[in-house]
């Protein structure tokens, strides 16, 4: 009798385990191969029990029975994982099957390629990176130092670029080099450098509100919250003090994420007090060339930078980039190429980033803008995911 009960228990457990296994089909409707695009799987989409833990699941490519890199994220910070991330490779106009099952990937990456953190040891930056690009922006201590006329501060809500040319993480290494006095990240010793000037400009993706032809913007962020870091995505939230745009009280916060393989960060900005935001790309010394394509939803600026060149870019989802303004002025750092995006339910979604000639495959303006066109096409035609019942 005991043997029968044991066998029944074993069989029941086996059936329950297999019931948790899911096959998903990822379809690519475009005539181009797709990779470095992140698919998000929820328990609901997978048909899993509410008590299931996504961190206990792994994914295999069924065509070759190999494990696929995954990452789980608790988006709302309630202690329960909300999504299981992975980046499938799917050929042009084709489908690919993957198995989601309870298990562990023995080949899981130990490198946190998509990384971000608050940096109190360098005043109070917030910095983020992936295997292609790195960025930072500035906090309240840096602002107060400027206001108190203390050297070393920075007053801006613009987004700074760190021009890396290696695929491994550099944020901690560069800050340690700078704060220890052993070196500087303003000089390229083989990994790249920070020679990108922001000042009062919007840098790469800072926003403004236009009232009667004048642009207004916030000061430095006042609070931050890291949501996730890992092999596929880093994401975090920045909040700003209320600010004034010619009598209009503006509230602003940003959910920013950067995925593996992308040259562009994703921004979801929440803002009240205006109907449209203007997302800026700095024009620096106005020695570069702008590119605009409202139909495909992107703006670009290709310019010289020291002994190289760089492309800056803004991409917005279909029919959301309403217009642009090539705003040129003699005021220091205030010349920006602005993309105007109307808010929907107080939110706007857009992507901004860069491609440095020394640290990317983009060697000229045309190659950079081809990337922006392709990026726009992909976000407007996302991979289609179906769970087989």
Predicted feature locations:
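Polysaccharide-binding surfaces and accessory modules of carbohydrate-active proteins
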Residues: 21, 278-327
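Short, well-ordered beta-strand segments enriched in hydrophobic/aromatic residues
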Residues: 24-28, 132, 254, 265-271
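Extended, loop-rich substrate-binding clefts of extracytoplasmic carbohydrate-active enzymes
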Residues: 179-259
């Amino acid at each position: 009798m005991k043997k029968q009960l044991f066998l029944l228990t074993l069989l029941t457990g086996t059936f329950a385990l297999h019931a948790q296994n899911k096959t998903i089909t990822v379809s690519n409707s475009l005539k181009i191969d797709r990779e470095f695009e992140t698919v998000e799987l929820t328990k609901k989409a997978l048909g899993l029990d509410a008590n299931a833990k996504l961190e206990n699941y792994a994914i295999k490519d069924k065509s070759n029975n190999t494990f696929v890199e995954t990452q789980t994220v608790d988006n709302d910070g309630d202690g329960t994982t909300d999504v299981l991330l992975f980046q499938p490779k799917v050929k042009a106009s084709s489908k690919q099957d993957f198995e989601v099952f309870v298990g562990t990937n023995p080949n899981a990456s130990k490198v946190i390629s998509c990384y971000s953190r608050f940096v109190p040891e360098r005043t109070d930056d917030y910095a983020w990176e992936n295997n292609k690009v790195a960025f930072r922006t500035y906090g309240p201590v840096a602002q107060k130092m400027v206001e108190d006329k203390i050297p070393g501060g920075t007053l801006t809500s613009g987004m700074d670029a760190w021009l890396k040319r290696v695929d491994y993480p550099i944020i901690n290494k560069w800050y340690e080099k700078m704060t220890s006095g052993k070196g500087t990240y303003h000089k390229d010793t083989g990994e790249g450098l920070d020679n990108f000037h922001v000042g009062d400009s919007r840098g790469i993706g800072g926003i403004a509100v236009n009232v009667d032809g004048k642009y207004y913007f916030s000061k430095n962020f006042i609070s931050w919250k890291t949501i996730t870091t890992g092999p596929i995505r880093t994401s975090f939230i920045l909040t700003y003090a209320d600010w004034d745009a010619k009598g209009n009280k503006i509230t602003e916060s940003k959910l920013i994420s950067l995925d593996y393989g992308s040259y562009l960060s994703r921004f979801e900005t929440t803002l009240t007090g205006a109907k449209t935001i203007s997302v800026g790309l700095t024009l620096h010394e106005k020695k570069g060339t702008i590119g605009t394509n409202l139909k495909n939803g992107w703006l670009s600026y290709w310019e010289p930078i020291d002994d190289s060149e760089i492309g800056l870019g803004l991409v917005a989802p279909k029919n959301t980039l309403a217009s642009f303004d090539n705003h040129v002025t003699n005021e220091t750092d205030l010349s920006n190429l602005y993309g105007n995006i109307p808010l929907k339910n107080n939110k706007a979604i857009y992507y901004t980033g860069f491609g440095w000639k020394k640290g990317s495959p983009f060697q000229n303006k045309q190659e950079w803008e081809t990337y922006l066109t392709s990026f726009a096409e992909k976000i407007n035609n996302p991979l289609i995911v179906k769970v087989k019942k």
